[in-house]
Design a protein with these regions (language model features):
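Glycine-rich phosphate-binding loop plus the immediately following alpha-helix
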Residues: 81-85, 170-185
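Single conserved hydrophobic/aromatic residue that forms the stacking wall/gate
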Residues: 1-9, 197-208
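A structural-propensity feature for long, helix-poor, extended segments
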Residues: 3, 180-199
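Acidic, glycine-rich active-site loops and adjacent beta-strand->loop/helix elements
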Residues: 30-32, 151, 191-195
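Internal alpha/beta core interface subdomains
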Residues: 14-134, 144
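Short, well-ordered loop/turn and helix-capping segments at boundaries between secondary-structure elements
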Residues: 13-16, 176, 180, 194
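Conserved phosphate/anionic-ligand binding catalytic regions in large, soluble enzymes, centered on
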Residues: 54-69, 143-178, 196-199
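Hydrophobic alpha-helical scaffolding
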Residues: 3, 77, 106, 160-164, ...
Length: 208
């Protein structure tokens, strides 16, 4: 039941080091990585043989898979008892069949997932920004810096596929990820590196 909360609890470690979270805002539209995503990610990587891509095994790929399949959980679901229970009843049987019949992994009980979601709701509540569109409008005439991790060669569409991440870390991803319209982004700055580096999505060295 505690699986899937590890990264969330790192917040406490960061707080102990003096990191201030008062400006942290989480969109209610953000997808939630569930513990079964982490298990599926680890299993897939371990059984990929020569096709192994060096994933971080944090469940990111499977989370995107469920998002695209429209069977994922979003932050906003945590704060609607009816919506959350409906989603659990719809999604969990699908995931359990997959866990058992495809991956040979243990199934999750309904109570386990509901309890986990309740813990997520409590942990995230101080940071969820339900009026995020108003927040964007408030700063529309100001200069805002969007900083993206990773880079072009890890883009799921334009990178060194399949040795890529699951999203679009290119400039256009700033608009999709933030809710800002593409026309509102006036300048894109790319940072290049002539050295070899190890990508977050692959164990191989890539040259950029």
């Amino acid at each position: 039941e505690s699986r899937g909360l590890g990264d969330v609890y790192k917040r406490q470690e960061l707080k102990a080091e003096g990191v201030d979270f008062k400006n942290l805002k989480i969109s209610p539209l953000a997808s939630i990585t569930m513990p079964y995503h982490i298990e599926i990610d680890g299993y897939s990587e371990a059984h990929s043989g020569k096709g192994k891509i060096g994933t971080t095994k944090k469940g990111i790929g499977p989370t995107y898979t469920d998002k695209a399949a429209r069977i994922g959980f979003k932050i906003q679901d945590l704060y609607s008892f009816e919506a959350l229970n409906e989603k659990i009843d719809m999604i969990l049987p699908i995931k359990n069949k997959m866990l058992k019949n495809v991956y040979g992994l243990e199934e999750y009980t309904r109570d386990c997932i509901l309890s986990l979601c309740e813990k997520y709701a409590e942990l995230f509540k101080p940071y969820v920004c339900f009026d995020w569109q108003d927040l964007l409008n408030r700063y529309k005439d100001k200069k805002i810096l969007f900083e993206g991790a990773q880079g072009v060669m890890l883009d799921v569409d334009y990178g060194t596929y399949p040795f890529v991440t699951s999203s679009n870390p290119i400039g256009g991803g700033a608009a999709v990820g933030s809710g800002y319209g593409p026309a509102m982004i006036k300048e894109v700055v790319g940072v290049s590196n002539c050295l070899l580096y190890t990508s977050d999505a692959a164990d191989d060295l890539l040259c950029v």
